[in-house]
Amino acid sequence: MIKAIIFDLDDTLYDYKALERAAFDCVGELVRERLGVSEEQYGDAFKRARLATKEKLGETATSHSRMLYFQKTLEYLDIRPLYLALEMYETYWGFFLDNMNLYPGARELLEALHEKYIRVGVCTDLLAHIQHRKLRRLGMMDDVDCLVTSEEAGVEKPAPGIFNLCLEKLRLSAEEVCFVGDNLERDVKGAIAAGLQAVWFHPVDETSQEEKAEDGIDAVSNYQELYELLAGEIEGGL
């Protein structure tokens, strides 16, 4: 039976995409006010900066660094990077963190898992510092028994090493752990390849209607469905 649940963080425990767009726009307002740069110029420079960073750094935690994105954005705009990059970074994450909330039903599930002595892990791509800040903002300090970031693991999902590090920290075998994540390839198939059970958390919206789970992969669209599914996998239910 299941003894631990490992969650992906972004877009699994809360709505990352919506906050990312809103935080990006918030930085855009700052750039337009301070530098007189148009929305289109800012957007184009940011896209170039993000792509260049990812191409340079590959599949690493640092490739997600907003500090690097904003520094390069200014460089592409022919502006000295020290002039505004730190303020852009702080504006982005300030807005982001101030507006974070768990998905409906997530808190109830976490409490139910705690009552059944089911351990909870979080396994996430990105830098440890900002993921710690997110989890604190979500009020999960007392919920998480194990945290693994790709910065710590040295690899990103779906590499088996990041999942194996979670198992080492939990001191459990792969068969005793279920992974819950929103990305079918990185989270779900990566976890399955590492020997874990897995559930695809897949809220249905206009951008995801065409994606389908393959045969044998459990999929849920909200936390009520996830609660009901996990209840059948945990001794004594939830």
Segments from the language model and where they lie:
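N-terminal helical cap/lid subdomain that shapes the substrate entry/recognition surface
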Residues: I2-P104
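Long, charge-rich low-complexity segments
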Residues: Y76, Y117-V120
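Asp-based, Mg2+/Mn2+-dependent phosphohydrolase catalytic module
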Residues: M1-I5, A18, E40, R107, ...
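Residue-level marker of alpha-helix boundaries and capping positions
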Residues: A61, M100, V122, C178-F179
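A short, Lys/Arg-enriched amphipathic alpha-helix followed by its capping loop at the start of a domain
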Residues: C26, L30, R34, L109-I118
